[in-house]
Amino acid sequence: MKLYSLSVFYKGEPKAVLLKAAYDVSSFSFFQRSSVQEFMTFTSQLIVERSAKGSRASVKEQEYLCHVYVRSDSLAGVVIADSEYPSRVAFTLLEKVLDEFSKQVDRIDWPVGSPATIHYTALDGHLSRYQNPREADPMSKVQAELDETKIILHNTMESLLERGEKLDDLVSKSEVLGTQSKAFYKTARKQNSCCAIM
């Protein structure tokens, strides 16, 4: 998972104005970096110009995903990432950056601003911090831990059963479970297997 670009634009009519951008082109060869960076800026600008105010979208281009968020006040953000990067985390980043940007940069500077004149230095920090979505986004971290716990629980249950033994056989032989509990287990098992086939 990788983030390549994080940019802030003002969606003017008809052109979008680049206000600030951060790039991570370290994975490209030295001679390709400036061209790749220019192409990312061009693509981001084009996506903002063609997106409606108050919208969010993800646009696929080869193995990359461009996530765009255009606010109703014409401030827009674009993240370019690989296709494995979680969309939810990308949009969380965009929302955070645009909120921060709108508080730090005066609104009258947006239509006439440029990367040289806008004083907002947090983009590089956000780009590097969000390279690992699990560390940057608490929900991703919790989801990853939950997935690991599910795997451990599944492996533990499987390891408790002896070779060739099935949970159904253990339930039917159990002296601890009452008749009603056994009937409940069988009914639940049938319903779950029915849904799994569909």
From Swiss-Prot:
It comes from the Eukaryota. Changing C194A: Loss of prenylation and normally targeted to vesicular structures. Normally targeted to vesicular structures. A lipid is attached at C194 (S-palmitoyl cysteine). Residues 196-198 form a propeptide. The longin domain regulates palmitoylation and membrane targeting. Vesicular soluble NSF attachment protein receptor (v-SNARE) mediating vesicle docking and fusion to a specific acceptor cellular compartment. Functions in endoplasmic reticulum to Golgi transport; as part of a SNARE complex composed of GOSR1, GOSR2 and STX5. Functions in early/recycling endosome to TGN transport; as part of a SNARE complex composed of BET1L, GOSR1 and STX5. Has a S-palmitoyl transferase activity. Identified in 2 different SNARE complexes; the first one composed of GOSR1, GOSR2 and STX5 and the second one composed of BET1L, GOSR1 and STX5. This is Synaptobrevin homolog YKT6. It comes from Rattus norvegicus. The gene is Ykt6.
